Amino acid sequence: MSGIIATYLIHDDSHNLEKKAEQIALGLTIGSWTHLPHLLQEQLKQHKGNVIHVEELAEHEHTNSYLRKKVKRGIIKIEYPLLNFSPDLPAILTTTFGKLSLDGEVKLIDLTFSDELKKHFPGPKFGIDGIRNLLQVHDRPLLMSIFKGMIGRNIGYLKTQLRDQAIGGVDIVKDDEILFENALTPLTKRIVSGKEVLQSVYETYGHKTLYAVNLTGRTFDLKENAKRAVQAGADILLFNVFAYGLDVLQSLAEDDEIPVPIMAHPAVSGAYSASKLYGVSSPLLLGKLLRYAGADFSLFPSPYGSVALEKEEALAISKYLTEDDAFFKKSFSVPSAGIHPGFVPFIVRDFGKDVVINAGGGIHGHPNGAQGGGKAFRTAIDATLQNKPLHEVDDINLHSALQIWGNPSYEVKL
C-alpha cells in the first residue's frame, strides 16, 4: 500500500453493501468506470479507489428507528491511491470523506496511512518521554489542573490560583480554553507573571510545575502569537485545534521557532464525532490524527466524568496516542471532565501510568482549596500505584475529597 485506506461504517437502504462501497470508491476518485472505454479505463486504473473489504453487521433496531427506514449496516474499507492527493490532511480528508460527509449515514471510522505517507507528518515534538524529561517525573501519572473563573479577573487572581495549584503538587496548570486575549490578563503578561510564581514555588517547595497558556487569535496571526509566547517563556501551548483545523496544528508543530509542546483541546470536535451514524470517529479525530499532526497531549472526555465517552472509545483514543510507531513519538492521553480523586484508580487501571489526570472542580472545589485538592490527588495517585485502597489511606485531604465526591473505586484493583 502506498496510499491510504479508509474504513467506514455505512447504512444502506438498498441492502447492497458491495454496490454502495463501489459507488463510494468511484465517487471519491474517478467518478465512473463501467461506461468508460477500455483505453480510458487503463489510463485511469491507477487512480481508481479500490474496495478491499466489505463486512455486514447485525441489524440494529435503534438505527432503523432513528433513520426511519430499514437499513443494512456494514464496515467497508477502500484504498485510495497516493497519486490522487497531496500528502497533507486537507487533501486526505477531502479525498476520503469530503462530499461523502454530507451523506448523513456514513461514519469515517479510521484512516490507515502508508509508511510513505507518514513521512510527511511531524508527530509530537516532545512526546511522553520529552514531557517527562521537562518535569523530571518518570514513575507516575502526571497531574494537571485548570484555571477556573478567570474571565473578568485580573493578573493577581491568576497568580494566586497558580500558586495554590503548584503548591498542591500539580505538574501542569492550563488556561481555560475560553480565556482569550484580553486587557486584564494578556498573553505575555500571563506567561511572565506565571513564570515568576512557579519559580518561587520551585525554590520554596522543590516542585516543578509547567503552565500551558492558551494560544488564540486569527489563524494567520497564530504563528506570530506563538512566537511571542515562546519569547516570553511559555512552557506549553494550549490550542483549540478543531476551531482552526488539524493542518494549522501541523503548521505550528513543524515550526522550529515554536520549540514547545502543544496541548490539543477537543473544543468543537463533538460537532464532527458525536453521532454514532455519521461524522468522524473520536479515536481517529482525537487520537491518530492529532498525534500525526503534532499534538504532545490530547484532551478528551473520560469514561467516568460529567461529559463521558463510552469506555471503548476513550481507550481507543488512548491506544492511537500511545501505540508503538516507528514514525512518531507517543502523545499523552488526557481523559477529562468531572474527574475527582475517587476516579484515580479507574484512570490508572484503564490508561496506565503514562496518562495525565486532569481536574478542575475536583481540585478547586476541595474544602482546603486548590492546595488541598492537589494534595488529595497526589495522595490518591501514590496510593493507587501501591495498590492501596483509597479509603485505607490516612490523609485528611484525600479523606475530605472522598467524603464530598465519593469513592467509586472502592473495589478497584490494578
UniProtKB/Swiss-Prot annotation:
Record pathway: Amino-acid biosynthesis; L-methionine biosynthesis via salvage pathway; L-methionine from S-methyl-5-thio-alpha-D-ribose 1-phosphate: step 3/6
Enzyme Commission number, as recorded: 5.3.2.5
Example of a GO MF term: magnesium ion binding
CDD domains linked: RLP_DK-MTP-1-P-enolase
Pfam families in alphabetical order: RuBisCO_large, RuBisCO_large_N
Required cofactor(s): Mg(2+)
Entry keywords, A to Z: Amino-acid biosynthesis, Isomerase, Magnesium, Metal-binding, Methionine biosynthesis
Modified residues (N6-carboxylysine): 174
Primary enzyme class: isomerase
Keyword Magnesium: yes
Active site: 99 (proton acceptor)
Assembly information from the UniProt record: Homodimer.
Family of the protein in this entry: Belongs to the RuBisCO large chain family. Type IV subfamily.
HAMAP family: Salvage_MtnW (MF_01679)
Its biological purpose: Catalyzes the enolization of 2,3-diketo-5-methylthiopentyl-1-phosphate (DK-MTP-1-P) into 2-hydroxy-3-keto-5-methylthiopentenyl-1-phosphate (HK-MTPenyl-1-P).
Further comment: Has no RuBP-carboxylation activity.
Protein name: 2,3-diketo-5-methylthiopentyl-1-phosphate enolase
Species this chain originates from: Bacillus cereus (strain B4264)
Gene that encodes the chain: mtnW
